[in-house]
């Protein structure tokens, strides 16, 4: 089961998620050691693949940088759950196939190190220590599809062959009928 890392403060900004001094690469594995460094210097050493960050409101505010998502994903974080997110961070999460889940009362329901059961289909997270279950805002199917594909670009690349197959029986584009005549 994934462990929970609680960052209870509201307005944790992208500079705290990945400090600007480390924005010299876009390789997740190279960003990972610096994830949350200015907030918790040892976070990247403790986090395990699939672990969950529980955070306060407006997580990801500040500068628009995809590196904030890449650093957390590179460190092994499986999802961030907060009451709400800065819109640009939320969109960057979707575009990069990373789970950002909105859930009221999440910070009060968990302590650092708790284990959790995250049920995406059911829209719930359960604290295994206390048995408390909370419901989060359902993830739109589109966002789940993008996440499953690994990000927006990968999702779109997968759509191109499907669209090409659909268009093979379509009428030729006007003016293209005699292109090879």
Swiss-Prot record:
Catalyzes the isomerization between 2-isopropylmalate and 3-isopropylmalate, via the formation of 2-isopropylmaleate. GO terms for molecular function: 3-isopropylmalate dehydratase activity. Pfam families: Aconitase_C. It comes from the Bacteria. The gene is leuD. It comes from Deinococcus deserti (strain DSM 17065 / CIP 109153 / LMG 22923 / VCD115). Its EC number is 4.2.1.33. It is an enzyme of class 4 (lyase). HAMAP family: LeuD_type2. Belongs to the LeuD family. LeuD type 2 subfamily. Gene3D superfamilies: Aconitase, domain 4. Pathway: Amino-acid biosynthesis; L-leucine biosynthesis; L-leucine from 3-methyl-2-oxobutanoate: step 2/4. This is 3-isopropylmalate dehydratase small subunit. It catalyses: (2R,3S)-3-isopropylmalate = (2S)-2-isopropylmalate. Heterodimer of LeuC and LeuD. Coiled coil: none annotated. The lineage of its organism: Bacteria, Thermotogati, Deinococcota, Deinococci, Deinococcales. Keywords: Amino-acid biosynthesis, Branched-chain amino acid biosynthesis, Leucine biosynthesis, Lyase. GO terms for biological process: L-leucine biosynthetic process. InterPro entries: Aconitase/3IPM_dehydase_swvl, AconitaseA/IPMdHydase_ssu_swvl, IPMI_Swivel, LeuD, LeuD_type2/HacB/DmdB.
